[in-house]
Swiss-Prot record:
PROSITE patterns named among the record's database cross-references: RRNA_A_DIMETH, SAM_RNA_A_N6_MT
Lineage, broadest ranks: Bacteria, Bacillati, Mycoplasmatota, Mycoplasmoidales, Metamycoplasmataceae
Family of the protein in this entry: Belongs to the class I-like SAM-binding methyltransferase superfamily. rRNA adenine N(6)-methyltransferase family. RsmA subfamily.
Pfam family, one: RrnaAD
EC number: 2.1.1.182
Known catalytic reactions: adenosine(1518)/adenosine(1519) in 16S rRNA + 4 S-adenosyl-L-methionine = N(6)-dimethyladenosine(1518)/N(6)-dimethyladenosine(1519) in 16S rRNA + 4 S-adenosyl-L-homocysteine + 4 H(+)
The protein's name in its UniProt record: Ribosomal RNA small subunit methyltransferase A
Molecular function GO labels: 16S rRNA (adenine(1518)-N(6)/adenine(1519)-N(6))-dimethyltransferase activity; RNA binding
Chain positions recorded as S-adenosyl-L-methionine binding sites: 13, 15, 39, 60, 84, 101
A single GO cellular-component term on record: cytosol
Keywords: Cytoplasm, Methyltransferase, RNA-binding, rRNA processing, S-adenosyl-L-methionine, Transferase
Function text: Specifically dimethylates two adjacent adenosines (A1518 and A1519) in the loop of a conserved hairpin near the 3'-end of 16S rRNA in the 30S particle. May play a critical role in biogenesis of 30S subunits.
Entries under SMART domains matching the protein: rADc (SM00650)
Length: 259
């Protein structure tokens, strides 16, 4: 069988650690579930998913891996799609679970693609760089708290499950990775979510500035004063100091009273 060659331009680091694969699978209820795997690489984790899942759909952008995967998983309950996940369309009405081992450069884009289609999914298990995992689960008043933290925690209950060292991959990455779980919240509203993402993105446009100096780029002084008076904010408050509930209320106030 042809040996897979990792492509640096795609940020490929293939999982090779059986214990990590088993640990990932332990965190998912695979019984009678349809799974989407983003970037199955050599199919190492795919093997473990196929043992328990009803069906696995794998998106793999690297065309050189497709014949290897097709040969390895012949006659299995698996569909391999040679396509960029960012271009994917989802038709099934049954909610699926997503498993992904993502390179740093595309993590946010893929997450927001999933968020935009939230009604199609119920859970994500994501392997990312450890620093990205810290941003996803970050709390207010911490250095890693960001618009990614807010978006992730708005859409789901997020947990950092465990750290994965470089030795678990080929080739070895230079930094640790971590596995994060997203359990999607019930009763999400697409328009409210879109508004929340739009608003919080602008609040964090310049992270080192005060909230006021971020808002001034799309609001006038009178509008900002209306917000500050209603929420009784200190003039020098920064975006990182406000929690998720406050941002939800802020976005709601903006779209119902100012926009």
């Amino acid at each position: 069988m042809q040996k897979p060659v990792p492509k640096k331009r795609l940020g490929q680091n293939f999982l090779k650690d059986r214990k990590i694969a088993e640990k990932i699978v332990e965190n998912i209820d695979l019984k009678n579930k349809e799974i989407i795997e983003i970037g199955c690489g050599t199919g190492f984790l795919t093997n473990f998913l196929l043992e328990k899942a009803k069906f696995v759909t794998c998106y793999e952008i690297d065309k050189n891996l497709i014949p290897i995967l097709e040969k390895k998983f012949k006659n299995k309950n698996l569909r391999i799609i040679n396509e960029d996940f960012l271009l994917a369309e989802f038709e099934s009405k049954e909610k699926k679970t997503i498993i992904a081992n993502l390179p740093y450069y595309i993590t946010s884009k893929i997450l927001f693609k999933i968020f935009a289609n939230f009604e199609k999914f119920d859970k994500i298990i994501l392997m990312v760089q450890n620093e990205v995992a810290d941003r996803i689960v970050a709390k207010p008043k911490t250095p890693t708290y960001s618009k990614l933290s807010l978006a992730s925690q708005y859409i789901a209950k997020v947990r950092k499950l465990f750290v994965v060292g470089p030795d678990s991959f080929f080739p070895k990455p230079k930094v640790n990775s971590a596995v994060v779980s997203f359990d999607f919240r019930a009763n999400l509203d697409a328009k409210e979510m879109e508004n929340f993402f739009w608003f919080t993105k602008r609040c964090f446009q310049f992270k080192r500035k005060t909230l006021y100096n971020n808002l001034i780029f799309f609001l006038n002084k009178q509008q900002i004063e209306k917000i500050y008076n209603f929420f009784q904010f200190a003039q020098n408050i920064r975006p990182q100091q406000l929690d998720l509930v406050t941002y939800i209320r802020l976005a709601d106030f903006y779209f119902n009273n100012i926009f």
